[in-house]
Amino acid sequence: MKRLDLLRWLEEHGCSLLREGGRHSVYVNRATGKSSTVPRHREINEFLARKICKDLELPAPK
């Protein structure tokens, strides 16, 4: 999955960027207070994308 597609999915479901790390970005679900890191790679493995959504308590991306 493309990183930009995952970021769009997260933002559509109420997540926002909390801060930028050295090689990753931290996104937070403001409704639940949960956060997760998103690596800065062009491609993100489907398993990792599902894990990020699970951490943020969101449905898995399509």
Question: Which ranges hold each PLM region?
Answer:
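Polyanion-binding surface elements
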Residues: M1-G14
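C-terminal structural segments of small proteins and small subunits
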Residues: H13, R30-K62
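Major-groove DNA-recognition helix of helix-turn-helix-type DNA-binding domains
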Residues: H13-N29
